UniProtKB/Swiss-Prot annotation:
Residues 1-28 are annotated as: Disordered. The gene is grpE. One of its GO terms (molecular function) is protein homodimerization activity. The keyword Lipid metabolism does not apply. Keywords: Chaperone, Cytoplasm, Stress response. One of its GO terms (biological process) is protein folding. Pfam families: GrpE. One of its GO terms (cellular component) is cytosol. InterPro entries: GrpE (IPR000740), GrpE_coiled_coil (IPR013805), GrpE_head (IPR009012). SUPFAM superfamilies: Coiled-coil domain of nucleotide exchange factor GrpE (SSF58014), Head domain of nucleotide exchange factor GrpE (SSF51064). This is Protein GrpE. Homodimer.
């Protein structure tokens, strides 16, 4: 038998064998199950990828917030580092102002000393002002409980109620933050 005859005989044998549909169906079913399994794995991997991406985005946002808060804390620390020192200087400023206020300006012998105290006060006010320490002088302004401390209330028909009519002690703020409220007398409507 030559090679051609063997091929023809093999083909006839293959054609003679009955093809059972269950074999094909089982192969298709197995392949479909494998495809479904792979699709499920792909979906799970995609879901895990999305979750990890969201987690990474949240971590980046959290780091940005942390960096921003740290920068704000450092800025506040620089801005208000002088708060205790400034609070200790307030009585000195008060005493210099009181000394000028109570000095006998008519006495010729005291005039050079009074001028010296005035210059010292101006110099000190200028120096502390450079660092953000500024006086609160609320005379004739509306009472603000955040910046003023009411020591008493006096009836006054000429001014609107809750207007500061006298300042007993100046208040001070450091870079916009009140470190000592002004002690004031406040008007109230006549009874």
């Amino acid at each position: 038998m030559n090679h051609e005859e063997q091929k023809v005989e093999a083909m006839e044998q293959v054609e003679a064998q009955p093809v059972e549909p269950t074999d094909v169906d089982s192969e298709v079913t197995a392949e479909q199950a494998r495809i479904a399994e792979l699709e499920a794995q792909l979906d799970a991997a995609q879901q895990a990828s999305l979750e990890e991406r969201e987690r990474a985005i949240r971590a980046v946002a959290e780091m940005e917030n942390l960096r921003r808060r740290a920068a704000q804390d450092v800025e506040k620390a620089h801005k208000f580092a002088l708060e205790k020192f400034a609070a200790e200087l307030l009585p000195v400023l008060d005493n210099l102002e009181r000394a000028i206020e109570l000095a006998d300006k008519e006495n010729e012998a005291l005039k050079p000393m009074i001028e010296g105290v005035e210059l010292t006060l101006k110099s000190m006010q200028s120096s502390v002002g450079k660092f953000g320490l500024n006086p609160l002088d609320p005379l004739n302004q509306p009472f603000d409980p955040n910046a003023h401390q009411a020591m008493s209330m006096i009836e006054n028909a000429e001014l609107a109620p809750n207007t500061v009519i006298a300042v007993m002690q100046k208040g001070y703020e450091l870079n916009g933050r009140v470190i000592r409220p002004a002690m004031v007398m406040v008007s109230k409507a006549p009874a």
